[in-house]
Amino acid sequence: MDRKNSQNPAAVTPARRRLLDTATRLFYAEGIHAVGIDRIIAEAGVAKATFYNHFPSKDDLVLAYVEEQDRLGREAVAALPKQSPRKMIAAILGRISAAVAPGGWRGCPFLNAAAEYPDQNSPVRRAIGARRKWYHDVLKQLLAADGDPTPSVTASLLVALSDGLLEIAYLDDAKDVPTLVREGLERLLVRR
């Protein structure tokens, strides 16, 4: 897979931006494998040659989509106001409530993409795995700074809580998510 410009937002041409924006909208709304390249090209208003200049294959586009979602998430966490480790954890998980609140939530884009790419050795799954490791490590570092006696275990539980909340918001009712975030944090962080 070609990784040209995949993580450098400044290097993104207008055509590439339209392709990524169109793919993001369609992949999220309809599913990755349900959307063909021809439709993405048509809706982005680019020539087929332009698509292939930026993405040698659809899998390259999917990888760029996953990497961009990862980059945006990391930037959002980095932009959170610096506060105590416990409040940072609450703010990070609180982003779940903010993400699902506007409506139109169709589940976590990473979990959705993973479901469509079952081969754990595929570049898409490796990118998702790197995202999950980063998320776990951020939580683990904050938990260690907060004095958690088993920060890796608690971080794994918080990742599982996050995954569950993202899917509950899609499958059940997003209005319950803020309460579940608060309750989950109270129960998991009370361990010390």
Regions found by a protein language model. Give the residues of each.
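Short hydrophobic/aromatic patch on the recognition helix
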Residues: 45-55
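Basic, helix-initiating cap at the start of DNA-binding domains
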Residues: 1-30, 34-46, 60
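C-terminal peripheral helix-coil segments that are non-catalytic and often amphipathic
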Residues: 1-6, 98, 130-149, 171-192
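Hydrophobic alpha-helical connector segments
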Residues: 64, 77-104, 155-158
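Alpha-helical DNA-contacting segments of helix-turn-helix folds
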Residues: 55, 62-69, 76
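Amphipathic alpha-helical packing segments from all-alpha helical-bundle domains
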Residues: 74-80, 87-90, 120-145, 153-156, ...
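Amphipathic alpha-helical segments used for helix-helix packing
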Residues: 100-126
